[in-house]
């Protein structure tokens, strides 16, 4: 990664908006592009050279012909550009379009001083601060996961992982009225999950955790389990924990393989649901979620780096220090 001058996009073209990025969150999926591991990214596109950054807070500089945003307005960017014609797009699930393009991956992203994006990708956030605005994108992934899992008020849910996505899932589930247990090995992250609405936080070996959750649910197991950690060993545990007729939502991505007993599916009639990215509707709901909980979310933003130290920020994030949660690059 280098700091370099690039061509100015000039005035907004038809259907597009020019924005001035303020803050960009670093995500685990960014590591693949940064390290050259593009095989883990979707689509046979030309990746390099590429300006990264898909968790973006920005100020509108030129709204072009867009009628939805105004000059000077702060916006979050929904980074997904679906094709619009495939089966998922035609059925309202553009988030899994096989030909999608992603800002910051297939197209240049927010780690630059001016960025041109389609008007359909910008969402006004009112007086939300830049860090929280950048967090709308990961929050939208949590919102989508819980939409897939059909979270219900009053029901018990277990969230595996208290990274940014897991914490956002804890927040969103609690905001929906669910009773949440969040599982993570790092005490500081468990503490933050508690502050974001978890009823219980825990970390224990497999059998001890199973016993603890069974006790919490009066022996039934939780109706909903959301896996955000990406650890291959968690899925078999989730299938064991979830109640009969329950739902398991898999958000965390892993290139490994997980061993489990297929008989658990007909025996318990479990719904196992994948969850990827977010729809535009999820993104709008995430704007509302983050806006309503901005004070609680402030502790998520653990480290800040200026744009001139972006490479250092990525290397720091990839070292996975235990005190780091969401690392933000300030752009302008």
Regions found by a protein language model. Give the residues of each.
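Glycine-rich beta-strand-centered segment in the early N-terminal region that forms part
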Residues: 9-24, 39-87, 126-128
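Rossmann-fold dehydrogenase core element
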Residues: 247, 260-299
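Local beta-strand N-terminus motif with an aromatic residue
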Residues: 154, 221-222, 297, 310
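C-terminal hydrophobic helical "lid"/dimerization subdomain
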Residues: 187, 236-240, 280-332
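Residues in the short beta-alpha loop(s) of Rossmann-like NAD(P)-binding domains
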Residues: 37, 186, 254, 278
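NAD(P)H dinucleotide-binding glycine-rich loop of Rossmann-like/cofactor-binding domains
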Residues: 54, 81-160, 298
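Mid-domain Rossmann-like dinucleotide-binding core that forms the NAD(H)/NADP(H) cofactor-binding site
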Residues: 128-207, 211
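Glycine-rich cofactor phosphate-binding loops and adjacent beta1-alpha1 units
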Residues: 149, 191, 196-271, 311
């Amino acid at each position: 990664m280098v700091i370099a001058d690039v061509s100015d996009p000039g005035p907004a073209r038809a259907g597009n908006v020019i924005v001035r990025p303020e803050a960009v969150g670093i995500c685990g999926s960014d590591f693949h592009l940064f390290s050259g591991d593009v095989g883990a990214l979707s689509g046979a596109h030309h990746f390099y050279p590429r300006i990264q950054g898909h968790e973006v807070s920005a100020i509108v500089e030129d709204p072009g012909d867009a009628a939805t945003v105004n000059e000077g307005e702060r916006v979050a960017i929904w980074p997904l550009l679906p094709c619009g014609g495939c089966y998922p797009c035609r059925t309202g699930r553009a988030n899994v379009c096989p030909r999608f393009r992603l800002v910051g991956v297939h197209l240049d992203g927010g780690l630059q001083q001016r960025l041109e994006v389609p008007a359909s990708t910008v969402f006004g956030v009112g007086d939300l601060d830049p860090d929280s605005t950048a967090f709308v994108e990961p929050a939208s992934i949590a919102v989508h996961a819980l939409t897939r899992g059909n979270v219900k008020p009053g029901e018990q849910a277990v969230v595996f992982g208290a990274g940014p996505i897991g914490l956002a899932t804890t927040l969103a589930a609690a905001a929906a009225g669910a009773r949440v247990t969040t599982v993570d090995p790092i005490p500081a992250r468990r503490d933050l999950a508690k502050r974001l609405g978890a009823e219980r936080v825990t970390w224990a070996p497999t059998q001890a955790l199973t016993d603890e959750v069974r006790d919490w649910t009066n022996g039934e197991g939780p109706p909903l389990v959301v896996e955000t950690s990406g650890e291959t060993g968690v899925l078999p545990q989730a299938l064991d924990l979830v109640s009969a007729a329950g739902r398991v939502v898999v958000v965390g991505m892993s290139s490994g393989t997980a061993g489990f007993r297929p008989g658990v599916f007909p025996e318990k009639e479990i719904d196992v649901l994948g969850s990827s990215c977010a729809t535009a509707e999820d993104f709008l709901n995430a704007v509302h979620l983050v806006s309503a909980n901005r004070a609680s979310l402030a502790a998520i933003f653990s480290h800040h780096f200026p744009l001139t130290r972006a490479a250092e920020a990525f290397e720091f994030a990839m070292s996975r220090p235990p005190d780091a949660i969401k690392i933000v690059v300030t752009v302008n």
